[in-house]
């Protein structure tokens, strides 16, 4: 999965059926710009991230849980050239 600052506001994956890599976003971000990612997992799968992701409050999840939905909020931080990741929760 490669989010794009130029075209994505929300990304919905309704039946993730394999391991997933969330690559660094492409495009030109505006400082503070957001993208919300929602992924529902069919089984337990690993999650890996590009090198620009930075978690706040808790570590980024490394596995999806069968039958659960993961929410990730991405915030462009052009000052630090990072993707600040917030709003992590699994329901």
Where are these regions (language model features)?
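Short carbohydrate-recognition loop motifs
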Residues: 7-13
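Acidic, glycine/polar-enriched metal-coordinating patches/loops
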Residues: 14-91
């Amino acid at each position: 999965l490669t989010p794009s600052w130029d075209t994505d506001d929300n990304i919905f994956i309704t039946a993730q059926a394999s391991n997933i890599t969330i690559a660094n976003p492409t495009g030109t971000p505006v400082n503070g710009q957001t993208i919300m990612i929602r992924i529902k997992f069919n089984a337990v799968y690993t999650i890996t991230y590009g090198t620009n992701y930075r978690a706040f409050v808790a570590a980024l999840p490394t596995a999806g849980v069968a039958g659960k939905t993961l929410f990730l909020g991405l915030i462009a931080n052009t000052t630090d050239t990072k993707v600040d990741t917030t709003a992590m929760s699994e329901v």
